[in-house]
Design a protein with these regions (language model features):
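N-terminal secretory signal peptides that target proteins for export/translocation
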Residues: 1-6
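Bacterial N-terminal signal peptides
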Residues: 9-19
Length: 318
């Protein structure tokens, strides 16, 4: 979940034993290769066209209160040289009684490092609204002071940075999309020394990503990729994927999220402007063996407007 892995049991009584709602990790995307700007502002404008991406993710389908995420992002190069990129993104993220809304502006500046190499510096700035309705929870006792007061649209600022290096066939990115660690408080409910108790925490997420495109034949491209996510106090998360692009139209692939899930991915380039993508995750944890979890899925649409004389003759695989 964007900015948060909350220790919330979805509507079950054991929630009353949890000391606070913890915020640790950003939203989880299987199709992150089409949604790169959300985790690295250096990607803004780097497709050299006006690119608009919409994505919906439903996680752990069948489990009440499970995470749901919607993302809308658009970005484009500016000016004749395209060195400057500008983007905007909005994210809605829900899990159990918690709803989060993010809105960010992304800025990037590109420099040439070689004939084919480019290095892009990115900056992200925006805000975050957190809403927690504890009335939706089923607790052993209604007198639990930790959950007496809801959090209503609590605002937090956000600043992030990113580096993105790329060539026509390779990319490498390093980023931290949220550099501001924030504690949300339920003031006065507990007798702490400062008169407040921590309800939610947002921690810095660090991302390292890389991929390479190999030409297997005139009509077949292969791209292995890896994404690593590091959060202090949370397990290391590593995603590895392998995708094939056939006839510049059809994408098929698979991914593995370390100790978490196996995924299947498919995409279809309907036209030069429109790409449709779908991903499905099978949990490899104990949660995946329950009758309440039917896996997770994502649906993605990407629409791009090309300049009249600057159309991409060969679709970029990233």
């Amino acid at each position: 979940m964007k900015g948060i892995i909350k220790r919330v049991c979805f509507g079950i009584s054991s929630l009353a034993l949890i000391p606070f709602v913890s915020a640790q990790q950003d939203a989880q995307y299987t199709q992150y290769m089409y949604n790169t700007m959300s985790i690295n502002p250096g990607y803004a404008g780097r497709r050299d066209v006006l690119s608009i991406v919409g994505l919906h993710r439903s996680q752990w389908v069948g489990l009440e209160g499970a995470p749901r995420t919607q993302t809308l992002a658009l970005h484009s190069p500016l000016g004749e040289t395209g060195k400057v990129g500008l983007g905007f993104s909005a994210i809605n993220d829900e899990i159990g009684p918690t709803k989060e809304t993010y809105f960010d502006i992304d800025f990037s500046y590109r420099i040439k490092t070689s004939e084919n190499g480019n290095l892009s510096f990115g900056l992200k700035a925006g805000g975050h609204l957190l809403d927690v309705d504890f009335d939706e929870l089923n607790l052993f006792t209604s007198s639990d002071v930790r959950f007496e007061q809801n959090i209503d649209n609590k605002f937090s600022p956000n600043v992030g940075v990113g580096l993105y290096y790329y060539t026509p066939k390779f990319y490498l990115g390093l980023s931290a999309p949220n550099l501001l660690e924030t504690d949300h408080f339920d003031e006065g409910n507990l007798n702490n020394s400062d008169g407040s108790s921590v309800i939610a925490e947002e921690r810095i997420n660090y991302y390292l990503m890389s991929g390479h495109t190999f030409t297997l034949s005139e009509d077949l491209l292969f791209k292995p990729a890896v994404l690593a996510k590091v959060v202090v106090g949370a397990p290391l998360q590593v995603d590895v994927s392998a995708n094939f692009l056939l006839y510049e139209r059809i994408t098929l692939g698979a991914a593995y999220r370390w100790d978490a899930a196996v995924s299947g991915l498919a995409g279809f380039q309907v036209s030069d402007q429109l790409l449709i993508g779908f991903a499905y995750d099978w949990e490899t944890t104990d949660l995946g063996n329950t009758q309440f979890n039917s896996g997770s899925y994502e649906v993605m649409l990407r629409f791009e407007l090309f300049k009249k004389y600057n159309r991409m003759l060969t679709p970029r695989f990233f």
